[in-house]
Structures are given as C-alpha cells and as structure tokens.
Amino acid sequence: MTKLIIHLVSDSSVQTAKYAANSALAQFTSVKPKLYHWPMIRNLELLNEVLSKIEYKHGIVLYTIADQELRKTLTKFCYELKIPCISVIGKIIKEMSVFSGIEIEKEQNYNYKFDKTYFDTLNAIDYAIRHDDGQMLNELSEADIILIGPSRTSKTPTSVFLAYNGLKAANIPYVYNCPFPDFIEKDIDQLVVGLVINPNRLIEIREARLNLLQINENKSYTDFNIVQKECLEVRKICDQRNWPVIDVSTRSIEETAALIMRIYYNRKNKYNK
C-alpha cells in the first residue's frame, strides 16, 4: 500500500481538518495514511515547532487557522518545501465573500468559537451523558430526540454524536419482558426513533461484549428468539405510534446519526412552515 503522511494543523481541535482528511481518504483504498495532529496552534512559537516536524516528515498539510500572519507563515514554508498546503475552509470563505459581496474580516477573535452554538453543544453533551440508558426519564421533555432500542444497538454513541451536533438526545433500552417506560403512552413533541439490528449481528456484538467483561452466565442476552423478539417489539411500538425505525445492521454511527438529523430537521421545517 502507498503510504501518505498528512499533517493536520489547527488553531482549535483539528476536528474539521480531520473530518475533511478522512472523507478524502475514503476515496483511496490503496493508501495507508499517517495523520499527525497539531491542535491549538495560536502563536508563531507553536507554529515554528510544527514546521520543524513537517520539515522532518514531509506530507500534505491541511489547516484551519484564523490568524492571517500564521497562515502566511505556514503556506510560505510549505511552498518552499514544495509540499501541498490546503486550507480546509479557505475556498468556502472566499466563495461566500464573492457571492455575497461582503468583505472578509481581517481581524479575527478566537472568542468566535464560544458563541451560542458552542454552549448549546456543551449542554447537549451533558444532557446525553445524564440521560443515557434510560436515566432521568422525568426530564425527557427537554430532549430534542429520544432513541429506543434493544441493548447494543449503538444508542449511546449515536446520542453522543447527535450531541456534538447540538441536539439533546436521550436513549432508552428495550429489554424483553421488562415494562417499558410509560412515556410511550403520552403525546410527546420530541422525535422518537427506534433502532433495530439483524438478530444474528446483534448476538455477535453481545457475545463479544460478554467475553470482554468475562461474563458467562447470561443466556437470555444472546438467545436468538429473545433477541429477535426485542427487535420485533421495538418495531411494533414504533409502528403503532408512527415513529421512524432505523436498521443499524450495516450503518456506521455517523450514518445513523446523519439519517436521524435529516428526519429531525425535515420534521422541524415542516412544523415551522
């Protein structure tokens, strides 16, 4: 496989550059990437340390840096080394400016990240953690989204992923022969989504979980008939209330969350008309 070095340089968490890099790398199955993360680069001293690393290990540079002087220093350095230096959002900003006729602001303040959206995300993450696995059901009215499904159908990581996108998500497990919370009998405004999975796949996941925890005596947890009934019952609950159901058998966490967000915003736009 072809080895490819990518340096991710950012004045924040490098997540934007990382997402862009991974999206692009998905198009190259024969590439073995090595990603170097250089977050919180906000002054020349820190940038010079990174430049020495880049000089030692040449590779493509992806960056998200607000400070104009730091950008100039980085791009000039890469130009002299004859290595690609790509602004992840630079082209987008330029096109927005050209299309709107609004001049790009020269002075940037790092406090731009700490706006309402930033704090909404923090609150959503806190909410997802506190309302994981059926906890604090008395606060479901504060949720944007409620996920229900059998154990190990990726409810928790999906809730957290939604939280990183500013949406408060609670998740409630469905366990065979156990009473389900009575919220399902009430008229609620929140979007409720059922997560189900192929029973055989779910058994594999649960067996791996039990092996990891070194638990041997929990036959019902991996019994095919019970697992199948759990998934069927979740479908039944959702069908009766016209709640959407997503089969996560072949979906990644990101794909599941993206589909949920699409449903959520379509629903929200419909009600806001």
UniProtKB/Swiss-Prot annotation:
Keywords annotated in UniProt: Kinase, Nucleotide-binding, Serine/threonine-protein kinase, Transferase
GO MF, any single term: phosphotransferase activity, phosphate group as acceptor
EC number: 2.7.11.32, 2.7.4.27
Reactions listed under catalytic activity: N(tele)-phospho-L-histidyl/L-threonyl-[pyruvate, phosphate dikinase] + ADP = N(tele)-phospho-L-histidyl/O-phospho-L-threonyl-[pyruvate, phosphate dikinase] + AMP + H(+); N(tele)-phospho-L-histidyl/O-phospho-L-threonyl-[pyruvate, phosphate dikinase] + phosphate + H(+) = N(tele)-phospho-L-histidyl/L-threonyl-[pyruvate, phosphate dikinase] + diphosphate
Matching Pfam families: Kinase-PPPase (PF03618)
Binding annotation for ADP: 149-156
Any coiled-coil regions, as ranges: none
Top EC class of this enzyme: transferase
Family: Belongs to the pyruvate, phosphate/water dikinase regulatory protein family. PDRP subfamily.
Function: Bifunctional serine/threonine kinase and phosphorylase involved in the regulation of the pyruvate, phosphate dikinase (PPDK) by catalyzing its phosphorylation/dephosphorylation.
Identification of the protein by name: Putative pyruvate, phosphate dikinase regulatory protein
